[in-house]
Amino acid sequence: RWHDVDTDDFVARLNQFYADTRFHEFYQQHQEFYEEGLRTYETNVMQYFHQEWYARFYGTEPTEKFRVVIGFTNGGGNHGPHRQLSDLPKEVFAIVGYYVNPQTGKAYEKGLDYASTLIHEFNHSFVNPLLNDDSNIGMLKEIGQNLLKLSPIGMQRQNYAQWNIVVNESIVRAAVIIYMLDNGFSVEQQLKEIFDNVCRDFRWM
């Protein structure tokens, strides 16, 4: 989302901020809080995330490195930045929001609600490269354009206004449902996933 940014200047300023605010001391003072958040996420959310399924389902290893970061100061929002270092696999980050139930004071109580984001995003590591193949573009372009015509406003609102993005998102969302079938999710959980997609204008799910 950043354009024409001097990254060297940004990193220099970030390092200066780290020093000026004595951030390392702040982290040490709150280390138990962060570690408890990680333990809770591991227990409540990661139990639903079975990374070995992906290579088995797609028949290939991922071409990207997938990393999960808890955004303790981000509220409930999720972000998906990436970086490409020379001669190294592309790294894709799922920066997941930190949410605490205000009634109970506990974090990530409904683990599946948060795991679905990981399950979805990791599928993109396998699905997105498919449209780098010209033969796949030839087969899927017309389909993607037709799907886009079925729900142009809904797709536009979600920044999915290009046929290739609609194809990627559709395949990923279908793969999530198959993931749930293969990993013993309840019928209610599967139906909720389908219903959520229909509500997001992916009515062909």
Language model: regions and residue ranges:
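Second-shell loop/turn segments in exported
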Residues: 35-44, 104-108, 113, 157-163
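Short, flexible loop/turn elements at secondary-structure junctions
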Residues: 58, 70-74, 99-100, 123, ...
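Stable alpha-helical elements in mature extracytoplasmic
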Residues: 10, 37, 50-53, 114, ...
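Auxiliary, metal-adjacent structural segments of Zn-dependent hydrolase domains
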Residues: 30-92
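Non-catalytic architectural context of zinc metalloproteases
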Residues: 1-44, 61
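Post-HExxH zinc-binding segment in Zn-dependent metallohydrolases
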Residues: 129-201
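Active-site recognition of the HExxH zinc-binding catalytic motif
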Residues: 112-133
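Active-site scaffold of zinc-dependent metalloenzymes
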Residues: 79-112
